[in-house]
Curated annotation (Swiss-Prot):
UniProt keyword annotations, A-Z: Chlorophyll, Chloroplast, Chromophore, Membrane, Photosynthesis, Photosystem II, Plastid, Thylakoid, Transmembrane, Transmembrane helix
Cofactor binding note: Binds multiple chlorophylls. PSII binds additional chlorophylls, carotenoids and specific lipids.
Function: One of the components of the core complex of photosystem II (PSII). It binds chlorophyll and helps catalyze the primary light-induced photochemical processes of PSII. PSII is a light-driven water:plastoquinone oxidoreductase, using light energy to abstract electrons from H(2)O, generating O(2) and a proton gradient subsequently used for ATP formation.
Family statement: Belongs to the PsbB/PsbC family. PsbB subfamily.
Keyword Hydrolase: no
Protein name according to UniProt: Photosystem II CP47 reaction center protein
Signal peptide: none
TM region(s), chain numbering: 21-36, 101-115, 140-156, 203-218, 237-252, 457-472
Bilayer topology: Multi-pass membrane protein
GO MF term (any one): electron transporter, transferring electrons within the cyclic electron transport pathway of photosynthesis activity
NCBIfam families: PS_II_CP47 (TIGR03039)
GO cellular component labels: chloroplast thylakoid membrane; photosystem II
Length: 508
């Protein structure tokens, strides 16, 4: 046929059997990739430390999606929450991966069958004997079936009526686990961070889809609408399908980047806005203040801060710190976290508590500045020592650790104080192992960043695809050079005045 690469899909334009075949093959490829990727991730995943080396630090991409839907156990005997299991059941991580691969193989065979047996009676119009598809009817069928699946997911899987529920956690990502969720039918259901909205919205959207599907199965479109929207043209289906996909991709890019109940931080890592707003830092200070109010010492109050909470308050876990073309997991960047050293509190020689100004997200380097409780600069690490007035040496800054591995340890040596002041710019201070993975010390993004970038990019690409194919189907006659009035234009004597359609002669 000699088609150029960008025209090859025309071979299935008027061939319903093989159109179905290539779509089944596409499903086989998607399911096969998902299953294979899951097995690869399971082969390299280390479940030993869910607090300091969780899945998102290791660059896992499909494991978080399985986990949020209720899969927590492995046939390897481990649980995602850190415990051990003796009987993981059929729906373990490996079981789900295997099911996808088996399904992929079946789809592969079905695609071959439909490619060979393409000329089926079901695709023939009994009036003309030519291949054709009743697209409005097919639309109704698909809408009905997707509505049933959507309703079933919300009413059974999420609620735990027949299924495990979904991953639910507290606002600080500390107590996450899989549990049933009751639908939220009030205004709270519209809060993107309320898990109950997932159940209620799937039930509502599924019900709407079922009703809309039945409507489109029982009511034929008006002729004017059918022709106006080119409902008989398969490219209309392509255009509207691309629209649905790019819209969904934009939505999930938003829910992933800004955070929601569907993207828990325990599975995908924290969002950049939690660093920007000092979200975890405020909670840590609140807990310490509450401890001090109960007559605990500073050391006791800081020692009760969960290591998991402290780890979230570290800039290396900010997905916006990773460069666009830095491949690899977060662990390949700053290393594998070993332990929390504790919270450093700096003081000058007059006993004032000093706070290190934290590095904003989009800075690679940032001056080390220490301010007091009123925001007044009291110390810094100067660029030019000759002109310095607030250097650590001049101000006599000391540092003492509370909580963590260095609890109770203090330093007055200026070089050591400056070292910890630089590290305090990056949030809570952790011991990081950079030797095991030969980590290069350059921050990487988390799967949250990759997912957002990928879906936003493809959404933009698919948006143009929707415009392209929509224009092709709406203006097909124009692009083909076929004008409905063309025959009248060239017919001798059709108009009293040449080229003026308002002077058309009446047929005798």
């Amino acid at each position: 046929m000699g088609l150029p690469w960008y025209r090859v899909h025309t071979v299935v334009l008027n061939d319903p059997g093989r159109l179905l075949s290539v779509h089944i093959m596409h499903t086989a490829l998607v399911a096969g990739w998902a299953g294979s990727m899951a097995l690869y991730e399971l082969a390299v995943f280390d479940p030993s430390d869910p607090v300091l080396d969780p899945m998102w630090r290791q660059g896992m991409f499909v494991i978080p999606f399985m986990t949020r839907l209720g899969i927590t156990n492995s046939w390897g005997g481990w649980s995602i929450t850190g415990g051990t299991v003796t009987n993981a059941g059929i729906w373990s991580y490996e079981g789900v991966a295997g099911a996808h691969i088996v399904f992929s193989g079946l789809c592969f065979l079905a695609a071959i069958w439909h490619w060979v047996y393409w000329d089926l009676e079901i695709f023939c119009d009994e009036r003309t004997g030519k291949p054709s598809l009743d697209l409005p009817k097919i639309f109704g069928i698909h809408l009905f079936l997707s509505g049933v699946a959507c309703f079933g997911f919300g009413a059974f899987h999420v609620t735990g009526l027949y299924g495990p529920g979904i991953w639910v956690s507290d606002p600080y990502g500390l107590t996450g686990k899989v549990q049933p969720v009751n639908p939220a039918w009030g205004v709270e259901g519209f809060d993107p961070f309320v898990p109950g909205g997932i159940a209620s919205h799937h039930i509502a959207a599924g019900t709407l889809g079922i009703l809309a599907g039945l409507f489109h199965l029982s009511v034929r479109p008006p002729q004017r609408l059918y022709k106006g929207l080119r409902m008989g043209n398969i490219e209309t289906v392509l255009s509207s399908s691309i629209a649905a996909v790019f819209f969904a991709a934009f939505v999930v890019a938003g829910t992933m980047w800004y955070g929601s109940a569907t993207t828990p931080i325990e599975l995908f890592g924290p969002t950049r806005y939690q660093w920007d707003q000092g979200y975890f830092q405020q909670e840590i200070y609140r807990r310490v203040s509450a401890g001090l109010a109960e007559n605990q010492s500073l050391s006791e109050a800081w020692s009760k801060i969960p290591e998991k909470l402290a780890f979230y308050d570290y800039i290396g876990n900010n997905p916006a710190k990773g460069g666009l073309f830095r491949a690899g997991s977060m662990d390949n960047g700053d290393g594998i976290a070993i332990g929390w050293l504790g919270h450093p509190i700096f003081r000058d020689k007059e006993g004032r508590e000093l706070f290190v100004r934290r590095m904003p997200t989009f800075f690679e380097t940032f001056p080390v500045v220490l301010v007091d409780g009123d925001g007044i600069v009291r110390a810094d690490v100067p660029f030019r020592r000759a002109e310095s007035k607030y250097s650590v040496e001049q101000v006599g800054v000391t540092v003492e650790f509370y909580g963590g591995e260095l609890n109770g340890v203090s330093y007055s040596d200026p070089a050591t104080v400056k070292k910890y002041a630089r590290r305090a710019q990056l949030g809570e201070i952790f011991e990081l192992d950079r030797a095991t993975l030969k980590s290069d010390g350059v921050f990487r993004s988390s799967p949250r960043g990759w997912f957002t970038f990928g879906h936003a990019s493809f959404a933009l690409l698919f948006f143009f695809g929707h415009i392209w194919h929509g224009a092709r189907t709406l203006f097909r006659d124009v692009f083909a050079g076929i004008d409905p009035d063309l025959d009248a234009q060239v017919e001798f004597g059709a108009f009293q005045k040449i080229g003026d359609p308002t002077t058309r002669r009446q047929a005798v």
